[in-house]
Amino acid sequence: MSNEEKSLHISKCLELAILLEVGAEKPGNVNFTSGFKGTRCEHFLASAVAAGPAFQTAAYRGILVAKSKLGICEVGLGQLIKTCAADIKAWQKGGNTILGTIMLFMPVAVAAGMAPTKKNYAFDLSLLRKNIDLAVKSTTALDSVHLYEAVDIANPSGLNDAPDLDVTDPRSKERLIKENVSLYEVFKIASGYDDVCSEWVHNYPVTFDLAYPYLMEQLKSKPLNTAVVHTFLKILSERPDTFIARKVGKEKAQEVSLDAKAVLELGGLETAKGKKSLRQFDKKLRLSKNKCNPGTTADLTAAALALCTLSGYRP
């Protein structure tokens, strides 16, 4: 496999993961049958396609790192995320769709580029995880600035005042450079209230240790939609959604987690009671003008699917 073929392969794996996540009928999220005001499924589908070139570039840079043709500090994760955010905005009109997902995916793309592939073009996930850690810990202050610019481009909701280096404060970018604050350090500040940042800082524990193993076990005996929805519920039941917490408070996020746990305990999509409970849960999440949309849980579900596709899974 040539460098170009490998980087394209990685990009396709990540695009597919986004498409599979979006297509699943997860409660409170946008899917093929339910949307938000101004944001529908087609916006997410367009976003997945638009993200492809940046994923491919990230993977290619990872390949160059492995060949000692590029320093790992020169990968430019922040710039890659910014470019990806701009491409996504140019290709759809539904506002911010997958910023959290591309923040999680970009280090994965670089890490996969750094790793050798097996005969079936799958990746060793233990090595992938080590490479992710190297990539995120090698970020720079310039990566931080570019990430802040990516947030400006995507304009996500739910941004509250941060304890330090607030992304909505124009002065923060100057401080990032002046104080030489790497993107890893920025995410460390935010890791206590944002699970996407927490994944970066703690080497993707929810993705690798909870979501992916559970998803793979589900896929052994269940259809894809059921497996993805159940994985989403499993994550949500154990990790109160930080997107919800930032919008409406930790107490409400905890309540949503308990509801997700109850749906799973009733059998989820495999029993009549579980299906009824899931429908009620979905309706409840949509009542508050989608302020209870488990958006971070969707990002983590997508990350688990990315590990699946990089491991060789195909629908």
Language-model features, listed with the residues they occupy:
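A broadly conserved amphipathic alpha-helix scaffold signal in soluble, globular proteins
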Residues: A86, M106-V110, D133
